[in-house]
Swiss-Prot record:
Tissue expression notes: Accumulates preferentially in the roots and is located predominantly in the region of the endodermis, low levels are seen in the leaves, stems and other shoot organs.
Binding-site residues for S-adenosyl-L-methionine, renumbered to this chain: G208, D231, D251, M252, K265
Superkingdom of origin: Eukaryota
EC number: 2.1.1.-
Summary of subunit composition and partner proteins: Homodimer.
Species assigned in the record: Zea mays
Entry's family note: Belongs to the class I-like SAM-binding methyltransferase superfamily. Cation-independent O-methyltransferase family. COMT subfamily.
Active site location: H269
Pfam family, one: Methyltransf_2
Gene that specifies this protein: ZRP4
Name by which UniProt lists this protein: O-methyltransferase ZRP4
Length: 364
């Protein structure tokens, strides 16, 4: 016999607690994902043709013998969060039937690593690294107090993020690879969804372009476009050498090499209003007038643009608070528009074809 609370106040209390628990324990979803990446469970299932029982997964992942029985519990979280699926087993009682785990569109993004065009494991590994996660414990205090440094990341680690990437090679690789994996996926979609953005230009400089994943994708799709990357010297030092893309060490706050178009992907949301204006003023000096094809191509969120379902809205809101850790922000159209006009641009066009993100073409 099923017992349930017999008064609606009790039921509402339980519902409220459940809702609260969902948010309180949401970090366990992230930690389960982090474990799955660490154990390379997606690869193990992939090696079994996309569907594998627990014992087949166990034959491919390295587990301490005492932890074997816990893997099923981890898989239960990963299936309820849609990272993996399960195949119903025909016959046998529930107790003795072994579930078969399958890849979902989500876990297909976890197969392989840098070698795979779509692999998103490096970005997840970056976001879930303690260096990035730990500053958020200070978020409440940051709202209340004048901290010695207004940047939560700097407050926690004693250095800004780009100073830390300079000093810590492991963290630098984590950031470079993480962002490169995102660039590979999103720039590929941008090229397919909005090829006209890259047509009609003969040169492009990717400012803050990291190790060049976006520039390489553009150069491959549009071989007539001469692509270069401007980034800090310690990042450029790690860039690939056998590529058509030219890497230039420099500081975007000082000067930007000339090109028909400047790409800024996941860069401006790292900076406050005034810094964005400074960067865009330098971009304007680097490009020809609008009539000659000059433009800045931004890939970032435009809060409120794109699909308006709850998942997209929630992700934009979460990302805006996430990027607070380095004093960055996600912006709505009005906020972007103010930056563009202060930096001396005449017009812009938002192309909301990248899910939670958009392409913005900005014209001098
Ligand atoms: C969030 S990452 C984006 C990387 C790349 N655009 C992507 O999305 O894959 C920001 C990049 O800006 C670079 N950066 C930071 N300060 C810079 C500066 N003053 N001049 C040039 N690049 C800078 C960082 O080294 C880093 O590669």
């Amino acid at each position: 016999m099923e017992l349930s609370p017999n008064n609606s106040t009790d039921q509402s209390l339980l519902d409220a607690q459940l809702e609260l628990w969902h948010t309180t324990f949401a970090f366990m979803k992230s930690m389960a994902l982090k474990s799955a990446i660490h154990l390379r469970i997606a690869d193990a299932i992939h090696l079994h043709g996309g569907a594998a029982s627990l014992s087949q997964i166990l034959s491919k992942v390295h587990l301490h013998p005492s932890r074997v029985s816990s893997l099923r519990r981890l898989m239960r979280v990963l299936t309820t969060t849609n990272v993996f699926g399960t195949q119903p087993l025909g016959g046998g009682s529930d107790d003795d039937s072994e579930p078969v785990y399958t890849l979902t569109p989500v876990s297909r993004l976890l197969i392989g690593s840098q070698s795979s065009q779509l692999a998103q494991t490096p970005l997840a590994a970056m976001v879930l690294d303690p260096t990035i996660v730990s500053p958020f414990s200070e978020l409440g205090a940051w709202f209340q107090h004048e901290l010695p440094d207004p940047c939560i990341f700097k407050h926690t680690h004693g250095r800004g993020i780009w100073e830390l990437t300079k000093d810590d090679a492991t963290f630098d690789a984590l950031v470079n690879d993480g962002l490169a994996s995102d660039s590979q996926l999103i720039v590929d979609v941008a090229i397919k969804q909005s090829a006209e953005v890259f047509q009609g230009i003969s040169s492009l400089v990717d400012v803050g372009g990291g190790i060049g994943a976006a520039a390489q994708a553009i150069s491959k799709a549009f071989p007539h476009v001469k692509c270069s990357v401007l980034d800090l010297a310690h990042v450029v030092a790690k860039a690939p050498t056998h590529t058509d893309v030219q890497f230039i060490a420099g500081d975007m706050f000082e000067s930007i090499p000339p090109a028909d178009a400047v790409l800024l992907k996941s860069v401006l949301h790292d900076w406050d209003h005034d810094d964005c204006v400074k960067i865009l003023k330098n971009c304007k000096k680097a490009i020809p007038p609008r009539e000659a094809g000059g433009k800045v191509i931004i890939i970032n969120m435009v809060v409120g643009a794109g699909p308006s379902d709850m998942k997209h809205k929630e992700m934009q809101a979460i990302f805006d608070v996430y990027i607070m850790f380095i004093n960055g922000m996600e912006r709505d159209e009005q906020e972007w528009s103010k930056i563009f006009s202060e930096a001396g641009y005449s017009d812009y066009r938002i192309i909301p074809v990248l899910g939670v993100r958009s392409i913005i073409e900005v014209y001098p």
